[in-house]
Amino acid sequence: MFTSKANAIFQDVINTYHLINTVDQGFTNVYDETSNLIEHLLYRKCWIDTVQWHYEDIIRDPQIDPVAALTLKRKIDASNQDRTDMVEYIDGYFLNKYAHVTPKSSAKINSESPAWAIDRLSILALKIYHMNEEVERKDASESHIAACQTKLNVLLEQRVDLSTAIDDLLEDIENGDKYMKVYKQMKMYNDDELNPVLRGQK
């Protein structure tokens, strides 16, 4: 199943990031873009998510320097754009993969594209990793650990359900029971023609 591969890649990315555990570390994609395109895209996608997860931790530091916070906010904006771009690349992969499929006359569209569901699966992998860290903390109270274990159990169940839904969606598309229709994300805040503040500075 597709999500078995995706979940394994996400876990590998998150484990690799935490070997050094800094947002400034270099990135190396272990999958070749030519011979392993979808693996390459999934690996890059989860790396972007993982770095941004830690950006979001840092910017919530109440003692953060305001200048550093502004710099970090712009990094988060850029990361969000990279994340969106990667989702669109992944959807492009599936559009190409299933281009030969003729949808049935009864085919329906899904509420989200495969790649946006995969985006949620990547974020879910990060939630599971960090919730598990809380469960394994030696300095935490028993009540904290118990509460986090309950949350972890829900997250693990959610991953099973989301993985099943994604695999079912891909199967439905392959069989012509559903069809893909992808909309470009109309990001406005980084566009100097659409953001009135940026437009006023031109």
Predicted regions and their residues:
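Anionic, Ser/Thr-rich low-complexity intrinsically disordered regions
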Residues: M1-K202
